[in-house]
Structure formats: structure tokens, C-alpha cells
Amino acid sequence: MDYGKCATQTTHKIITAEENKRKLTIDNPSGKVVRKIQVDGCLQIKSGKRCDYMFEIDAPISQVIYLELKGCDIKKAYDQLVATINIFRVEHGECKKECHIVASRVPRAGPKVQQLKITMLKNKQAQLFVSTDQAFVTI
């Protein structure tokens, strides 16, 4: 899919996305092709909810990382991730999927967060990670 000016492609060893003091850092030691796509505020999508960024790994795509940088509303962030997965379900059908919520405050592995992780895995075949302020991923 062509994302136009909303995407940048790189093989850099360190790739980041940052917004309002919240940050995801992707460690790419083997120099894989990574396409960083700004979804919210750039892509013209009819659906209202969407996550902030997604990262497509390799060509053809073998893995997708969906990212929502959020204040403290974990449920809203979860809904935005699910909406984005649904929008790109054809393009990312069989890919390994990871979803990251990087929030300013996160309830300590409480039952609500655990339930969201279970639901995401069951319904969308995607792992959900919830972090405070910063998250790190190695691909």
C-alpha cells in the first residue's frame, strides 16, 4: 500500500516515535527494512478512531507494530489500536502483530489491563504491551 508523505522507510539501527514526552524506541540491530507510518493526523482514513503510528517490518511485511501514545486513558488507546487493526486487516492479515500503548500513567498490571491483553490476543491475534512514558522493542 502506498502511504505517500505519511510514511518513511529506513534500515536504521534505532527508530523512534515520540509525542508529548511519550516515546517508543525500536532497536533494529540487523538493519531490517522498517516503514514508519503516521496514521493519526496524516493518513486519509474514513474511520474516526486510529492509532498514532504503525511500523511495517520487512518487505514483504512479516511484522506490524501498532503504537498509541496516550495520556492515561488506556481503554481509549486500546479502542484506537483495535480500530486501526480492523482498517488494515487485509494488508496485515497473516503478519505478526504487536500493539503498544505508551501512556503517562498506567495501572500496575491490574485486572483491567490484563483483560485487555487477553482480549487483544484472542480477538485480533496481537500481543498488547502497556508501558509508562517509554517503551523499547527489538525486532
Predicted regions span which residues?
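Glycine-rich, often proline-containing surface loops adjacent to acidic residues and nearby aromatics
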Residues: 60-66, 96-98
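Domain-level recognition of nuclease-like catalytic cores that cleave nucleotide substrates
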Residues: 2-4, 42, 101-139
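Active-site metal-binding core of divalent-cation-utilizing nuclease and nuclease-like domains
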Residues: 20-58
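An active-site-proximal "capping" alpha-helix that borders the catalytic cofactor pocket
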Residues: 84
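Solvent-exposed, charged helical/coil patches
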Residues: 1-32
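Active-site-adjacent loop/helix micro-motif of nuclease/hydrolase catalytic cores
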Residues: 45-46, 73-81, 110
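Conserved catalytic cores of phosphodiester-cleaving nucleases, focusing on short active-site segments
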Residues: 53-55, 63-71
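Nucleic-acid nuclease catalytic cores
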Residues: 74, 88-113
